[in-house]
Amino acid sequence: MKKGGLICFTGLDGSGKTTQAEKLLNTLKKKNIDAIYSWSRREPYLIKPIVTLVKKILKESSKSEGKDYLNIKKKRKRRLFKYPLFQKMWISIAIVDYLAKLFFQIYVPFYKGKVVICDRYIPDMIADFAANFDYNNYQIRKLLKNPLLRMFPKPDKYFYIKVPANLGYKRKLDDTSFEYLSEREKIYNFLAKEMNMVVINGTQDIDNVFEKIKVEMRI
């Protein structure tokens, strides 16, 4: 079966990755390249009922994480995530669930020869795990070697749109907390090196950022 292409954008909320992914999609379509856009944030799919139950146990509301991120994280660690066995089990289940979610979004079009422009992908999932479980760099490296990750199509390009947490916070119009972004900023910076991403300064204006992407894509 013919394989297509996979271009992934990753970075903090508020980095502008969605804007750049959409600009790339439009540019490729103008060149008559069969491309599609996939918003691929890891969210509960088959395991949604389990996640809902866990949140009820922890007495969390759907909007509470952004407003009270640090307290919720401490509560999770005290109750469930403090057990290493539970962490490993949960990560494996979540990865398989993510694979199922992406089957029609990425797998099918990719193996039909389309170019899939992915807004969020494996690094964003890893960043969530690392933040939730307070993983250090050594633990993140081990997580990147999880055999289940080999089942994901390998991207042709990883674009990390890099912005500081304070800028991402200013750009966001929802309840995302600064602490949430600050914690993940360090993780993304580490992942960018470990996964050989193309790092682009997202503090520039939109057109300048896209020019850098076009150079990397040779379009």
Residue ranges and their predicted role:
Residues 17:
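Conserved lysine of the Walker
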Residues 31-47:
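Short beta-strand-centered segment that lines the nucleotide-binding/catalytic pocket of NTP-utilizing
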Residues 12:
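P-loop (Walker A) phosphate-binding loop of NTP-binding proteins
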Residues 20:
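Hydrophobic positions on the alpha1 helix immediately C-terminal to the Walker A/P-loop
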Residues 166-219:
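NTP-dependent small-molecule kinase module
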Residues 9:
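Hydrophobic anchor at the beta1->P-loop junction of P-loop NTPases
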Residues 42-134, 139:
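ATP-dependent small-molecule kinase phosphotransfer cores
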Residues 115, 120-189:
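A glycine- and Lys/Arg-enriched "phosphate-lid" helix/loop adjacent to the NTP-binding pocket
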